[in-house]
Amino acid sequence: MKEEELALIINEHKKWLLDGTTGRQADLTGADLTGADLSGANMTGANLSGADLTRADLTGADLSGANMTGADLTRADLTGADLSVADLSGTNLTRVDLWGANLTRADLSGADLGGANLDYSCVPLWCGSLSTHFDDRQIKQFLYHVVKCGLNSKNASEEVKTELTKMIELANQFHRAGECGRIEI
């Protein structure tokens, strides 16, 4: 898609967001947005299903409530993006940078997050993310946080703490364990 055409669609979407009567909701279904600069764009509620956003710059973009089902965001930069309540089901998010991104209540069912940077992001822990494809690095990151919190919790039972101690070695393989503090018992 040409830059001018994309700028026009974004401008019409901005108008639509203001009052819902002027402008037009962005519909970029299946669009080729490879390498597009959408940094800081307000794409709330936009339809990006099936779009190719490979290597797109979406830093600080507002994609809350967007439909991104089946989109390809391979190697896209979503640093600080708002993806809350977005439908990311079946989305290719491999090697994407989600540092500091808000994924609250996002639907990640069937999404592939292999190699994605999830540091400082808000990843949903609900049924909509149970079929998400995380890689070993991310699973170790989650495990580290669960084990560390569980062992430090005054509310966790001894039974739970005993089971968590069995996972310390794996949890300490978290890529930032040295910085955050290795788990010791």
What is each stretch, according to the model?
Residues 1-35, 39, 44, 49, ...:
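Intrinsic low-complexity/IDR segments
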